[in-house]
C-alpha cells in the first residue's frame, strides 16, 4: 500500500486522538509505516507517577517489535503533536529510535496545521550511545 500525506496524516491523527494525557494535556501520536504495506500506531500514555509515562514513539516501536518486526521492516516514523512548532522526540525516544530503526529510515514531524519536516533517523541524534560502547 502506498501512503500519501493525507493517509499518513489521518492515521497518525487517530493515534493522536487516542492519547491518554490527562496530566499534561499534551497529546502525541506516532505512526510506523512498514515495508510490507502495514502500519502501526502508538500514542503517549501518561501516569500519575510521571516517570512511568510512555511516549507515542516508544509505544509504536515497542509494539512493532512485540509483533516481530525489526529495523529492516520500518520505512518511516510519523510523529504528530499539537503545537505551533514541530515537536521533536524527547531524548529517551531518540535513543530508542536510534537503537530500533535503521539510520536511513525517515522521521516525519507534523502538527495539526499540517506543517511537516522530514529527515533521516541519522539526522536526529548524532553521536548517540550505541552497542559499540558496550564492548559486546
Language-model features: locations:
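Short, charged/polar surface micro-motifs in flexible loops or helix N-caps
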Residues: 36-39, 47
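Short solvent-exposed loop/turn micro-motifs enriched in small/polar/acidic residues
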Residues: 23-25
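Short, well-ordered amphipathic alpha-helical segments that serve as non-catalytic structural scaffolds
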Residues: 14, 56-64
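Phosphate/pyrophosphate-binding loops at sites that engage ATP/ADP/AMP, CoA/4′-phosphopantetheine
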Residues: 65-71
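Compact, glycine-rich, soluble single-domain proteins
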Residues: 44-59
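Short beta-strand scaffold segments in enzyme catalytic cores
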Residues: 27-34
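C-terminal binding/interaction regions
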Residues: 2-21, 39, 72-136
Amino acid at each position: 500500500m502506498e501512503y500519501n500525506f493525507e493517509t499518513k496524516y489521518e492515521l497518525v491523527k487517530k493515534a493522536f486522538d487516542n492519547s491518554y494525557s490527562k496530566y499534561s494535556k499534551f497529546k502525541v501520536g506516532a505512526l510506523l509505516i512498514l515495508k510490507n504495506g502495514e502500519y502501526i500506531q502508538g500514542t503517549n500514555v501518561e501516569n500519575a507517577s510521571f516517570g512511568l509515562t510512555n511516549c507515542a514513539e516508544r509505544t509504536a516501536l515497542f509494539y512493532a517489535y512485540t509483533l516481530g518486526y525489526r529495523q529492516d521492516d520500518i520505512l518511516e516514523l510519523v510523529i504528530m503533536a499539537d503545537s505551533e512548532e514541530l515537536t521533536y522526540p524527547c531524548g529517551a525516544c531518540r535513543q530508542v529510535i536510534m537503537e530500533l530503526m535503521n539510520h536511513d529510515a525517515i522521521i516525519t514531524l507534523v502538527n495539526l496545521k499540517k506543517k511537516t519536516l522530514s529527515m533521516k533517523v541519522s539526522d536526529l541524534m548524532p553521536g548517540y550511545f550505541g552497542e559499540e560502547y558496550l564492548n559486546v
